[in-house]
Design a protein with these regions (language model features):
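Conserved phosphate-binding catalytic cores of ATP/NTP-utilizing and phosphoryl-transfer enzymes
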Residues: 1-6, 14-21, 25, 112, ...
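Phosphate/pyrophosphate-binding loops at sites that engage ATP/ADP/AMP, CoA/4′-phosphopantetheine
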Residues: 2, 104-118
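Active-site nucleophile and cofactor-binding loops and adjacent substrate-binding regions
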Residues: 6-10, 27-35, 95-98, 122-127, ...
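Acidic-glycine-rich active-site phosphate/pyrophosphate-binding loop
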Residues: 9-19, 70-77, 127-142
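Acidic, glycine/GT-rich loop-and beta-edge segments that sit at the periphery of enzyme/chaperone cores
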Residues: 14, 165-196
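Glycine-rich phosphate-binding loop plus the immediately following alpha-helix
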Residues: 20-63, 152-155, 161-165
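Adenine-nucleotide phosphate-binding core of ATP-dependent small-molecule kinases
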Residues: 77-106
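Glycine-rich phosphate-binding loops at beta-strand->alpha-helix junctions
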Residues: 99, 112-140, 151-152
């Protein structure tokens, strides 16, 4: 019995609420990828950390910095200020993990209370491979959630299941063969956009 599926990927977020084993609502972030996985990856690289090591640092944070739910441009300046004030990498990483979740819950999904998600929550998307993001979600939402081993490829897995279900014997695909793909050619040219 699942109440909600929260998917945070590298560029987008999705919240799928389930009622009576049926999709009740789907919410997506709009244009901005603020607070998605690419956001954390960028910060990790700027501090010369791999994403994995940066995430591990967060698990040992003593005082995670509060970045709120603002745009990454504003968060960038808050992180820089925290660095000037002597914040540790662990506290910065933990602060970013919390901000990803706060952004998802309070800006994208627009919750007033995280408990509105329900008790049975599945998290997916590559960002949830980050244990600090997972733990931040559990602490903010007040639940223990389920993170599948294949959290980062759940969308592809679902698409494969649908393709298998809809497959018809004898159906000929319209996709190009690998030889046809390798034989493709293209031309390039430089053009200036006249729309700006």
């Amino acid at each position: 019995e699942v109440d909600c599926i929260l998917d945070i990927g590298g560029q987008d977020m999705k919240c799928i609420k389930i009622k009576n084993q049926t999709v009740d609502s789907v919410q997506l972030n709009e244009a901005c990828s603020s607070g998605c996985g690419s956001f954390i990856e960028t910060f990790a690289k700027s501090l010369n950390f791999s994403v994995q090591d940066f995430a591990k640092e967060a698990l040992f944070a003593k005082n995670p910095i509060d970045l709120g739910t603002r745009c990454t441009v504003f968060m960038n300046s808050k992180v820089k200020q925290a660095q000037k004030e002597g914040a540790s990498v662990a506290d910065i990483s933990a602060g970013l993990a919390y901000s990803v979740i706060k952004n998802a819950l309070y800006k994208v999904i627009k919750l007033s209370d995280a408990k509105d998600l329900g008790q049975n929550i599945v998290v997916q998307g590559g960002t949830f491979y980050n244990d600090a993001v997972l733990r931040s979600f559990e602490k903010i939402a007040g639940v223990q959630c389920i993170r599948p081993d294949i959290a980062g490829i759940m969308g592809a897995f679902g698409a494969a299941l649908i393709a298998r279900e809809r497959h018809e014997e004898g159906y000929q695909t319209s996709m190009l063969s690998i030889d046809e793909i390798n034989a493709l050619t293209f031309d390039t040219k430089l053009a200036r956009c006249q729309g700006c």
